[in-house]
Amino acid sequence: MPTILLVEDNELNRDMLSRRLERKGYTVLMAVNGQQGVDMALASPPALILMDMSLPIMDGWEATRRIKADERTRHIPIIALTAHAMDGDEQKAREAGCDDYDVKPIELPRLLEKMERLLKA
C-alpha cells in the first residue's frame, strides 16, 4: 500500500487517523507542523499528503504552496483537512494547490474514497 504523509499538529487527531489508515494497510508518516511536512515531503516524497490547514510554524496553506512549487513534489496529491469549514476555504485550498478538501471530524469512508481516487489518477 502507498505511503501517506499526515501533517497534523493535534496529537489525538494525528494518532487516531494514523491508526485507522494503518489498519487499512497504508504506511503513515507524520509531521507536526507545516515546515516539518515540507521537509519530509522533499526528503522522501509520499504517494499522498493529508494536510491540516491550521498548523504551527508554517500553516498548511503555505506548506501546500511550497510542496506544489517544487518540481520534485508538485505531482503529489494533497487533501486539505480543516476543522473550520468557512465559506471560501475549499476555493482557498484549491488555489493553494490542494487536490481535494475534507472537513473534520474526519469520516473515514469519505476520506478513503477521496484518497483512492487521487492515488489512481
What does each of the following model-derived ranges do?
Residues 8:
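Conserved acidic carboxylate
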Residues 15-23:
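Charged docking surfaces used in two-component/phosphorelay signaling
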Residues 25-32, 40:
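Short hydrophobic/Thr-rich beta-strand motif most characteristic of the beta2 strand and flanking loop
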Residues 44-50, 55:
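Active-site beta3 strand of CheY-like receiver
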Residues 56, 74, 86:
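The feature encodes the CheY-like receiver
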Residues 106-115:
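C-terminal output helix
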